[in-house]
A protein has these predicted regions:
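Transmembrane-helix signature of 12-pass secondary carriers
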Residues: 2-473
Length: 473
């Protein structure tokens, strides 16, 4: 898998078998991230076709895009608690089934509200995957490479996004349009959603091959099983000390509860930091590119075919930047990457705001010159790169490791739920802002949030590089 190519160097060679096994387990968990990205982006190429097929209003069409995010918030909120009660593996199995049901049902839907129900089911799966994959990976990975392995979640997400863009482009191209008949005489947009069934089945099959999280097993008082798994994950000279450390940590903690994240009726400061990181990750507007990319670039003056091709370019840049982040996150740390990313996003979003303002005609329609169009493309993809090398993967890394064992499950679920609520807000408001004020207003707002994110990280985020999960306070 891609993960093996990313992690080929020194660390794999030193403890070859255990390291490869760790990478394998992390890669399987990250398939949930792939489906997360795929399910989120597949609708990008079908928005116009759905509106025509269901004869829905612009508002209903917009809600059909954003509705998944409501399911995401619910799935993220409950996944951590379920994982603490039932285990990480059963929740991943349930997630795979939900992805499959959503993929099949979305393509079979005959009306907009039926379609929304299946998108909500997909949202439950995406929300759960956003919590359980980084949790599982952080609990099996040695601290020396935990950042890189945890970054596989974001790498898988962006590969999923690019895969959806490519599949949409190929299917729409072969059919002559997303609303045109494709295989078996069925509309192309249906096959876009059905294509997700393939990775869903792969995820389901691979989960059956992996063990439960050893840290969960220790909490469940199943130490012999945990020792057996840890023996395959760790070098012999650190096995006993790691088990002792986990045992001591488990003995000092109570069963995770959502009220544990409160002290004196107030949410713990560290949980607020996690929530704020999640919100800022969305408020810089990245998912406007991935949910409305084709609409955005057509508004900027590009044709439909070119807009879909730009989506593919955006997905490719996203993958490259995530690979760069994986190579850097354990070398220079989490906080420096976030600061650099915030600065880069503020600059590039500001450039886009200026370009959209200058190219707006008297009638409110954007008419870019060839020079402005090139500059907009460059600025947009530099923005995607800045996000992908920082806030994309690093927030997931931090959420997986910044909380201590006592509150980890509840805290991650709370932060991830906040992320999906923020995502929903951005997704729903973009068409409204676009219609009422134009692209320059939307991107001006995202620029402001990028600037604020820089100062937030500088003041409130602590470095977690090189620390054991049991050391987190």
């Amino acid at each position: 898998m891609v993960a093996l190519l990313v992690l080929w160097y020194d660390d794999i060679m030193k403890n070859h078998q255990s390291m490869l096994y760790t990478v394998f387990l992390s890669s399987v968990a990250a398939i949930g991230g792939f489906l997360f990205g795929y399910d989120s982006a597949v609708i990008n190429g079908a928005v116009a076709a759905l509106q025509g097929a269901f004869h829905s209003s612009a508002t209903a069409s917009g809600f059909s895009v954003a509705s998944m995010l409501l399911g995401c918030a619910v799935g993220a909120f409950f996944a951590g608690n379920l994982a603490d009660r039932l285990g990480r593996k059963p929740v991943m199995l349930l997630t795979a089934v939900l992805f499959l049901v959503s993929a099949l049902g979305s393509g079979l839907a005959t009306g907009v509200w039926e379609f929304i129900v299946y998108r909500l089911i997909g949202g439950l799966a995406v929300g759960a995957a956003s919590v359980i994959a980084p949790t599982y990976i952080s609990e099996i990975a040695p601290e020396k490479i935990r950042g890189r392995l945890a970054s596989l979640q974001q790498l898988a997400i962006v590969i999923g996004i690019l895969s959806a863009f490519l599949v949409n482009y190929v299917i729409a191209g072969a059919a002559g349009g997303s609303s045109m008949p494709f295989l078996l005489g069925l509309a192309a947009w249906k096959w876009m959603f059905w294509s997700e069934a393939v990775p869903s089945l792969l995820f389901l099959g691979f989960i059956l091959l992996i063990p439960e999280s050893p840290r969960y097993l220790m909490v469940a008082k199943r130490e012999p099983e945990a020792r057996k798994i840890l023996a395959r994950l760790l070098a012999p000279d650190v096995l006993d000390s790691t088990i002792t450390q986990i045992r001591e940590s488990v003995m000092q903690e109570r069963k995770p509860r959502y009220r544990d994240i409160f002290v004196g009726g107030r949410i713990l400061p560290v949980v607020w930091v996690g929530i704020s990181l999640s919100v800022f990750q969305q408020f810089v507007g990245i998912n406007v590119v991935f949910y409305y990319g084709s609409v955005l670039w057509q508004t900027a003056g590009f044709g439909e075919s070119k807009a879909l091709l730009i989506n593919v370019l955006s997905g490719t840049v996203n993958i490259v930047s995530t690979l760069v982040a994986i190579s850097l996150v354990d070398r220079i740390g989490r906080k420096p990457l976030l600061l650099a990313g915030s600065a880069g996003m503020a600059i590039t979003l500001g450039m886009l705001t200026v370009l959209f303002t200058l190219s707006k005609g008297a009638d409110g329609v954007i008419a870019m010159s060839s020079t402005q169009a090139v500059l907009a493309l460059v600025a947009a993809h530099l923005y995607i790169f800045c996000f992908g090398v920082s806030w994309g993967p690093v927030v997931w890394v931090l959420l997986g490791e910044m909380f201590n064992n006592r509150i980890r499950g509840a805290a991650i679920s709370t932060a991830a739920s906040a992320q999906w609520v923020a995502n929903f807000a951005i997704t729903m408001t973009f068409p409204i802002i676009l219609t009422a004020f134009g692209l320059f207003a939307a991107y001006g707002l995202y620029t402001l949030f990028a600037v604020l994110s820089f100062f937030f990280v500088a003041m409130f985020v602590k470095e977690t590089k090189g620390k054991r999960l049991e050391e987190m306070e």
